[in-house]
Amino acid sequence: MLILLPAVDVVDGRAVRLVQGKAGSETEYGSALDAALGWQRDGAEWIHLVDLDAAFGRGSNRELLAEVVGKLDVQVELSGGIRDDDSLAAALATGCARVNLGTAALENPQWCARAIGEHGDKVAVGLDVQTIDGQHRLRGRGWETDGGDLWEVLERLERQGCSRYVVTDVTKDGTLGGPNLDLLGAVADRTDAPVIASGGVSSLDDLRAIATLTGRGVEGAIVGKALYAGRFTLPQALAAVAE
């Protein structure tokens, strides 16, 4: 069954949602802790917790994120600004189930390989993809820099033994524009590692569509704006993917 990961994106201690990952496009939804506890109460088994300040290189919510992880009984995937030994150690020390490496995997392949080697399935790599002139390009640092060709980087990560990928279509994220099923399927077909879908989910039918890819290796879906905007409730979403 498809695993659902409600997203809590944190800016200055508050839960927010961005449009296409752009700084300044935030809509605020209250305290990060309250948001996370709310999703747990609604039946989430995983929370996707993102430090957007760290991702954009403008600060950190490290202590708060550790507090949130400590107060939750469910598993947490922690993301945002994890790009060196210090930030990786701090992220793992929160007690989260796993961390997502983003920019670091693109900018520092040697460090990324070591992190994957040392921490195994506690490390996933985020593949933030933008299609430009028919080419799948990766985006780094809050999606503002080019990180190379998707397939070349994926091949490298496969050799390094990456245990899981979180695939985001940057053009879809926060837009409620529907997920990029072709991209998800294409990545899943090129790896034996599980893939988590991120970006664009707008309806229960979108989740049902992603759920049809579980046989190809798509393990879960991160859901953000659709939940916060009230398109559906988490219990409705959990029921839809259990059908």
UniProtKB/Swiss-Prot annotation:
Superkingdom of the source species: Bacteria
Stored SUPFAM superfamilies: Ribulose-phoshate binding barrel
Active-site residues from the entry: 9, 128
Catalyses which reaction(s): 1-(5-phospho-beta-D-ribosyl)-5-[(5-phospho-beta-D-ribosylamino)methylideneamino]imidazole-4-carboxamide = 5-[(5-phospho-1-deoxy-D-ribulos-1-ylimino)methylamino]-1-(5-phospho-beta-D-ribosyl)imidazole-4-carboxamide; N-(5-phospho-beta-D-ribosyl)anthranilate = 1-(2-carboxyphenylamino)-1-deoxy-D-ribulose 5-phosphate
Subcellular location: Cytoplasm
Amino-acid biosynthesis among keywords: yes
The enzyme's E.C. designation: 5.3.1.16, 5.3.1.24
UniProt xrefs under Pfam families: His_biosynth
Keywords on record: Amino-acid biosynthesis, Aromatic amino acid biosynthesis, Cytoplasm, Histidine biosynthesis, Isomerase, Tryptophan biosynthesis
GO molecular function: 1-(5-phosphoribosyl)-5-[(5-phosphoribosylamino)methylideneamino]imidazole-4-carboxamide isomerase activity; phosphoribosylanthranilate isomerase activity
Annotated metabolic or biological route of this protein: Amino-acid biosynthesis; L-histidine biosynthesis; L-histidine from 5-phospho-alpha-D-ribose 1-diphosphate: step 4/9; Amino-acid biosynthesis; L-tryptophan biosynthesis; L-tryptophan from chorismate: step 3/5
Enzyme class: isomerase
InterPro entries listed in its UniProt record: Aldolase_TIM (IPR013785), His_biosynth (IPR006062), HisA/PriA_Actinobacteria (IPR010188), Isoase_HisA-like (IPR044524), Isoase_HisA-like_bact (IPR023016), RibuloseP-bd_barrel (IPR011060)
GO BP field: L-histidine biosynthetic process; L-tryptophan biosynthetic process
Main location group: cytoplasm
Cellular component terms per the entry's GO annotation: cytoplasm
Family according to the record: Belongs to the HisA/HisF family.
NCBIfam families: hisA-trpF
HAMAP family (alphabetical): HisA
Functional summary from the UniProt entry: Involved in both the histidine and tryptophan biosynthetic pathways.
Protein name according to UniProt: Phosphoribosyl isomerase A
Name of the encoding gene: priA
